[in-house]
């Protein structure tokens, strides 16, 4: 299984070679998918995450993953059941808020790429011991943000992070300047309230 995970690390290197910001979408209505698809295509955004926080989340993944320009990830991934459902609707990778044996085993048996969520050195060590080197650092700003990531670089030189939680237009460039930050993830580019309001003009302005 570890060899499969090591190969998966290379998958993420390919996904995020040129795109260092991962938009996080929370979609309540399916018709939003078409508008968001247009906006992403206009702005060269190919990789993004749809969270499993709404009733239509899996349908939204299914709709947007049918566009061959997109690599759609599933967020808020927590159980083996989540994994199976996500794979069935076309998700190409998963991102979790934390770690568990069920999550690791479910992703590994299905060769499903995972960015596990970590918040402590212990969780980093557990993930690294299974071969995971690309990790979600969550919730980033609450855990110390920039300074915490700098502190983690020494003991974990082989790990790289996707800080998530509190990342915004004012601080994302500072995070990206860190050598152990692979990319940043956040909803500031596509705020849920603007999606719910269908304020596509404002979202275009932000992006």
Residue ranges and their predicted role:
Residues 93, 97-103, 136-146, 180-202:
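Glycine-rich phosphate-binding active-site loops on the catalytic face of alpha/beta enzymes
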Residues 41-46, 67-70, 87-94, 108-115, ...:
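Glycine-enriched alpha-helix->loop->beta-strand junction motifs that scaffold or abut catalytic
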Residues 102-133, 138-143:
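Histidine/lysine/aspartate-rich catalytic loop segments that bind and position anionic ligands
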Residues 1-92, 109, 169-170, 197-207:
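Conserved N-terminal beta1-alpha1 strand-loop-helix module at the mouth
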Residues 154-207:
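Hydrophobic secondary-structure block in the mid-to-C-terminal portion of proteins
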């Amino acid at each position: 299984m570890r060899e499969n995970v090591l190969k998966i690390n290379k998958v993420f290197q390919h996904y995020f070679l040129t795109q260092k910001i991962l938009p996080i979408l929370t979609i309540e209505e399916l018709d939003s998918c078409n508008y968001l698809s247009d906006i992403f295509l206009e702005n060269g955004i190919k990789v993004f995450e749809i969270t499993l926080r709404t009733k239509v989340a899996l349908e939204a993944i299914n709709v947007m993953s049918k566009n061959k320009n997109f690599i759609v990830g599933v967020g808020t991934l927590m159980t083996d059941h989540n994994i199976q459902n996500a794979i069935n609707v076309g998700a190409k990778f998963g991102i979790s808020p934390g770690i568990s044996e069920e999550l690791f085993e479910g992703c590994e048996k299905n060769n499903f790429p995972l960015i596990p969520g970590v918040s402590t050195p212990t969780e980093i060590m557990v993930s690294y011991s299974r071969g995971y080197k690309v990790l979600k650092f969550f919730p980033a700003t609450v855990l110390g943000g920039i300074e915490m990531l700098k502190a983690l670089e020494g003991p974990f030189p082989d790990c790289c992070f996707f800080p998530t939680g509190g990342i915004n237009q004012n601080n994302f460039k500072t995070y990206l300047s860190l050598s152990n930050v692979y990319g940043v993830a956040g909803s500031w580019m596509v705020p849920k309230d603007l999606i719910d309001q269908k304020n596509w003009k404002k979202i275009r302005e932000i992006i």
